[in-house]
């Protein structure tokens, strides 16, 4: 302990009223010393005190000391032993307030008065605090909060009557209004009653995160029973232990959990959309439920090795919920995140308390909780969240405009946590235990130094002597927190219940000893100090060390075992659960270190540790399985013959993390990455775990390297940002980089390779000072494109993700290319989205071909041709030197005002957001005839045939109007030099040119087809020469910048052979067809109407975007109807 010199900052003068000395054998000084020892003992919790006293020094055994001149005063330690327990209290300098000094002196005066009035009194009967302190504590804790006499489901019923159509539950599998929630819950309750459920029964509930879990909870309550939430991630043995203790007869479950639930009890009832009992509710009478009846049971860790259950009744929960809802500012407009695992009571508060307030429960799927946490919170517009500080850190640096209230608990907030969140939300620090209705104290954090757990809510809090719960401790002294409320937990062991001692305030109340040590602050708030016993909490999850040890000792390979929570020397803020093991097989020790407490590791012990860990994982929840296993020759003991946990903890603190890892099975072989994905994953693990790159082998277990569930979420988020998409479940199950890299799969590897090969998929654009735009390429980095994997259950969910991916494109900052892989119903869908600035339809053919080849053969190296930038530079140079811009303006059929008037869009903007799209799809027979006999008979290409049909139908629909000048679109990859090869180059090469075909309404279709053929073929290089001379000529560029609005553009995309051929890896999804020609809402359109045609799955389709102001009935519909008739006539006339 570092030396420190106390410095007095102020002085308190206090005059005491003392009684006359009643006996000559005891001096006043002795009384004062004894009284001061008692006061120190009461205020520090120590039964053995040491303090300094000042003496005159004349009593020293020195001749003539009494007649000496000069200062002889001295300060000596005074030992006042009250009991035999030794404890040296330590208090940092500057931590004693003036008010506390005043209380100490008042207490000293009271103790002195009692001592001097009755010198024969027992020390234990002396007052433990001053009268002023007693009065203050009574003011803080003297009144019990109001007790609710309602049941949980009754309050939710009231909300359904008030807001029947309001959203009660928003979940991955759908939403429920309050009316739908109550109707479904009534159906579940009726089904339970039909199966013989009675009041007082316990009903386990086994669901994944879905909308049916709140229905099941309310259904059980309405049937008069109590629910028990089961966590589906728990090992089967633990679930069997819980259900066996409840004597389970009926289990409610989801459809997916039915097989597992059926193994836990005689009868499993699955709740799902098509369950018959939801549609046909039998006529049954629901039982009358008393507020004293049990509402739910929550199981926590037990020191005997068996989980122990706390039973919470309706009265207790409702009283607590009404109090914490007020503190949380929860109401009907609240959208509360349901994040916690069903194994923890916070999940009950997130669900039931929200419904009692009339809010919406926003349920995240397990995939969203672990892999898409921040995005899901944002998407659901969550207003309230209850998280641990570690989990909340995953939301930092994210825009969460809807989040209003953030309640943190389960572990201490750091200064950084308080600093970050205080300015963004109403930040609250909360404390609670499962046995007392989830939440017991709360503090709204108003400045960064606030560390306390706040004030009681819904309960009365007392700080009592940890050895005698009937004695209060002084303000500022450490004691055990005792909570007093409507009733104690009715199903818990009586060992934690407190009787109506001096601190109890009424016979109707029940008190519960929490086992947590706290102290009062000056304002009556409470500060958490530590646990009284061996129950511990790691990353917000509380459990008993004894339970872990019980299971360890039952393993055959272990002779003796104990556990501690300790942090390595190089990770002081990362505590781990460490198991110390005395193995039965002595060969697990290194002979040369037999005398050391912790011997050197051996291969035998590493294998043994792996076996032990596997066995524990099959029995215990993951957070209760030790991360580190260390062999010991013998367990160190204290003088009282108990295991010396302090020494074991100190031993761990001497070792670095890499030293401790030497005892794990992963140290047996350290293998380097063998491919790019493994290398990238290794870098992610190094960064998040905070260890050297060389320390991470591809076959090392994530958990042996120090990972946990929260760190796994950080790893997944960082890996995704680098294009390596996997899930927390993958880490939990696969554990190693090698296995995860294999799981990431061929699709992601192919996508990474695609972006590495084609620079345009890494293009960015910057606007320069003169307003011109400049294109550049980024090098390949993890952020240069986005790859995501999604588990979806509906087309609606997929559409939402598609929309998010589309809006994520950003040509300035990236990405310009995204890949989403969807898993749904045993199938996979691949969504690729590229910005039109960097690719065209020919580019998509290249992308599909490359992706298919690289998925089928990871070693495939696609042939690359000239880069887009090189081509663009050469084209501009050629255009400037050799091409003359055409004279005058671009040809058009009519002027723009007349054009707008004709279409009925005089006053409308012409952007993507101001457009609508009409889809025309021809059948397969007509498509086949058009591109076979019809084209051959007229001696035209398919694009010329379609162009002719469009023009012919227009002039016949509007004979009084001048014929259209249709601007044709082409792929633009014609080259002026044979050395220029862009056949496999990704980029936007599209050209546009006016096709001037002079036709009349009296012309036949054959005549129009020949005219169109002639006009299109007369344009050099499919319009490339014209387009380049206008737009890629440095002498013409500025003059062309304000080019006029085109009336009609026509593009024939042809046939996507990669998705048409038998055996092709890809096939086009119907959803993708609808988005094939999609554009941004704010993007200006260059034509009044665009006709895009393509053949998909053997069917000719026209996608026709047009201005929203278009007079459809007068103009568009008659023309499109005539176009279809024209195509039908072509197919039948030339078949």
Curated annotation (Swiss-Prot):
Region (Adenylation) location: 177-562
Bias (Low complexity) ranges: 491-502
EC number, as in UniProt: 6.3.2.-
Segments of this protein annotated with the region Condensation 2: 746-999
Domain spans labelled Carrier: 672-748
GO MF entries: ligase activity; phosphopantetheine binding
Chain segments carrying region Disordered: 485-507
Chain positions with O-(pantetheine 4'-phosphoryl)serine modification: 709
Regions crossing the membrane: none
Keywords noted in UniProt: Ligase, Phosphopantetheine, Phosphoprotein, Repeat, Virulence
Annotated GO CC locations: cytoplasm
Region (Condensation 1): 23-77
Keyword Repeat: yes
GO BP, sorted A to Z: amino acid activation for nonribosomal peptide biosynthetic process; nonribosomal peptide biosynthetic process; secondary metabolic process; secondary metabolite biosynthetic process
Function, as annotated: Nonribosomal peptide synthesis (NRPS) is a key mechanism responsible for the biosynthesis of bioactive metabolites which are potentially contributing to organismal virulence.
Domain statement: NRP synthetases are composed of discrete domains (adenylation (A), thiolation (T) or peptidyl carrier protein (PCP) and condensation (C) domains) which when grouped together are referred to as a single module. Each module is responsible for the recognition (via the A domain) and incorporation of a single amino acid into the growing peptide product. Thus, an NRP synthetase is generally composed of one or more modules and can terminate in a thioesterase domain (TE) that releases the newly synthesized peptide from the enzyme.
Record-stated family: Belongs to the NRP synthetase family.
Protein's UniProt name: Nonribosomal peptide synthetase 9
The species this protein was found in: Aspergillus fumigatus (strain ATCC MYA-4609 / CBS 101355 / FGSC A1100 / Af293)
Lineage per the UniProt record: Eukaryota, Fungi, Dikarya, Ascomycota, Pezizomycotina
């Amino acid at each position: 302990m570092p030396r420190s010199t106390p410095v007095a900052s102020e002085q308190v003068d206090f005059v005491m009223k003392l009684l006359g000395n009643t006996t000559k054998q005891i001096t006043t000084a002795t009384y004062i010393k004894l009284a001061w020892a008692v006061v120190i003992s009461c205020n520090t919790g120590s039964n053995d005190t040491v303090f300094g006293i000042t003496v005159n020094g004349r009593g020293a055994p020195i001749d003539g000391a009494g007649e000496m001149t000069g200062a002889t005063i001295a300060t000596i330690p005074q030992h006042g032993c009250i009991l035999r327990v030794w404890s040296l209290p330590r208090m940092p300098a500057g931590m004693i307030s003036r008010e506390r000094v005043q209380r100490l002196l008042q207490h000293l005066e009271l103790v002195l008065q009692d001592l001097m009035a009755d010198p024969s009194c027992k020390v234990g009967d002396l007052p433990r605090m001053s009268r002023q302190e007693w009065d203050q504590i009574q003011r803080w804790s003297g009144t019990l909060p109001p007790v609710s006499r309602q049941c949980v489901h009754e309050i939710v019923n009231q909300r359904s009557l008030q807001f029947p159509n309001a959203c009660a539950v928003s979940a991955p599998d759908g939403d429920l209004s309050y009316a739908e929630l109550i109707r479904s819950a009534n159906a579940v309750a009726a089904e339970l009653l039909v199966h013989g459920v009675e009041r007082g029964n316990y009903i386990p509930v086994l669901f994944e995160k879905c909308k049916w879990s709140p229905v099941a909870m309310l259904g059980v309550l309405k049937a008069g029973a109590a629910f028990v939430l089961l966590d589906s991630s728990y090992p089967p043995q633990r679930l069997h232990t819980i259900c066996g203790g409840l004597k389970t007869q009926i289990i409610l479950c989801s459809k997916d959990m039915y097989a597992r639930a059926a193994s836990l009890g005689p009868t499993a009832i699955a709740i799902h959309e098509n369950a018959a009992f939801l549609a046909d509710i039998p006529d049954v009478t629901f039982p009358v439920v008393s507020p004293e009846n049990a509402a739910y049971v929550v199981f926590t860790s037990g020191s005997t090795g068996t989980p122990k259950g706390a039973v919470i009744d309706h009265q207790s929960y409702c009283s607590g919920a009404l109090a914490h809802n007020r503190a949380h500012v929860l109401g009907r407009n609240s959208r509360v995140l349901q994040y916690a695992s069903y194994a923890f009571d916070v999940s009950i508060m997130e669900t039931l308390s929200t419904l009692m307030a009339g809010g919406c429960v926003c349920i995240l799927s397990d995939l969203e909780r672990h892999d898409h946490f921040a995005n899901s919170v944002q998407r659901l517009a969550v207003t309230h969240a209850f998280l641990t500080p570690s989990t909340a850190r995953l939301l930092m640096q994210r825009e969460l405009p809807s989040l209003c209230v953030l309640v943190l608990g389960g572990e201490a907030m750091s200064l950084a946590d308080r600093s970050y969140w205080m300015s963004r939300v109403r930040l609250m620090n909360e404390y609670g235990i499962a046995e007392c209705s989830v939440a017991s104290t709360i503090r709204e954090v108003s400045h960064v130094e606030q560390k306390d757990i706040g004030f009681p809510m819904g309960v009365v809090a007392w700080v009592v002597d940890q050895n005698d719960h009937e004695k209060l401790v002084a303000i500022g002294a450490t004691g055990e927190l005792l909570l007093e409320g409507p009733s104690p937990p009715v199903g818990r062991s009586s060992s934690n219940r407190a009787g109506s001692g001096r601190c109890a305030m009424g016979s109707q109340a029940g008190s519960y000893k929490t086992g947590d040590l706290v102290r009062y602050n000056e304002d009556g708030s409470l500060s958490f100090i530590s646990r009284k016993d061996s129950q511990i909490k790691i990353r917000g999850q509380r459990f008993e060390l004894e339970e872990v040890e019980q299971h360890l000792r039952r393993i055959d390979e272990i002779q003796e075992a104990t556990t501690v929570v300790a942090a390595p020397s190089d990770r002081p803020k990362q505590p781990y659960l460490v198991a110390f093991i005395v193995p039965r097989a002595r060969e697990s020790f290194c002979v040369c270190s037999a005398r050391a407490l912790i011997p050197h590791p051996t291969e035998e012990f590493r294998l043994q540790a792996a076996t032990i860990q596997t066995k524990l994982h099959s029995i215990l929840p993951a957070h209760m399985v030790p991360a580190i296993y260390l062999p010991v020759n013998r367990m160190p003991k204290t003088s009282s013959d108990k295991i010396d946990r302090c020494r074991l903890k100190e031993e761990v603190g001497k070792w670095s993390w890499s030293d401790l890892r030497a005892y794990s099975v992963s140290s047996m072989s350290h293998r380097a990455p063998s491919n790019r994905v493994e290398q990238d994953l290794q870098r992610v693990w190094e960064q998040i775990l905070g260890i050297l790159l060389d320390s991470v082998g591809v076959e090392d277990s994530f958990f042996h390297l120090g990972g946990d569930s929260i760190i796994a979420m950080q790893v997944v988020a960082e890996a995704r940002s680098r294009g390596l998409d996997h899930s927390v479940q993958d880490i939990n199950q696969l554990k190693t980089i090698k296995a995860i890299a294999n799981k990431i799969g061929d699709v992601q590897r192919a996508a990474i390779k695609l972006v590495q090969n084609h620079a345009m998929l890494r293009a960015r654009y910057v606007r320069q000072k003169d307003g011109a735009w400049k294109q550049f390429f980024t090098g390949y980095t993890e952020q240069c494109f986005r790859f995501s994997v999604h588990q979806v259950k509906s087309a609606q969910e997929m559409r939402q993700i598609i929309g998010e991916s589309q809006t994520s494109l950003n040509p300035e900052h990236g990405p310009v290319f995204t890949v989403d892989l969807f898993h749904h119903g045993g199938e996979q869908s691949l969504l690729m989205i590229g910005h039109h600035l960097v690719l065209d339809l020919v580019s998509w053919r290249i992308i599909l071909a490359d992706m298919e080849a690289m998925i089928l053969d990871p070693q495939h190296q696609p042939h690359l041709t000239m880069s887009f930038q090189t081509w663009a530079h050469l084209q501009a140079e050629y255009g400037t030197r050799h091409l003359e811009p055409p004279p005058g303006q671009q040809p058009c059929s009519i002027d723009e005002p007349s054009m707008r008037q004709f279409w009925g869009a005089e006053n409308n903007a012409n952007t993507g957001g101001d457009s609508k799209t009409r889809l025309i799809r021809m059948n397969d027979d007509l498509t086949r005839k058009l591109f076979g006999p019809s084209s051959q008979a007229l001696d035209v290409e398919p694009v010329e045939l379609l162009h002719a049909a469009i023009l012919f139908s227009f002039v016949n629909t509007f004979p009084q109007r001048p014929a259209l000048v249709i601007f044709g679109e082409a792929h633009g990859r014609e080259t002026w030099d044979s050395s220029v090869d862009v056949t496999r180059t990704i980029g936007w090469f599209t050209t546009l040119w006016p096709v001037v075909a002079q036709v009349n309404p009296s012309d036949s279709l054959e005549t129009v087809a020949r005219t169109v053929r002639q006009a299109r073929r007369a344009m050099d290089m499919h319009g490339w020469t014209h387009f380049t001379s206008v737009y890629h000529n440095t002498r013409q560029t500025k003059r062309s910048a304000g080019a006029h609005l085109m009336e009609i553009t026509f593009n024939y995309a042809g046939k996507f052979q990669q998705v048409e051929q038998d055996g092709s890896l890809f096939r086009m999804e119907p959803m993708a067809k609808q988005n094939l020609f999609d554009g941004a809402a704010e993007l200006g359109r260059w034509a009044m109407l665009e006709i895009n045609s393509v053949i998909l799955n053997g069917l000719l389709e026209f996608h026709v975007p047009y201005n929203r102001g278009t007079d459809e009935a007068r103009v568009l519909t008659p023309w499109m109807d005539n176009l279809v008739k024209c195509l039908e006539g072509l197919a039948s006339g030339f078949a």
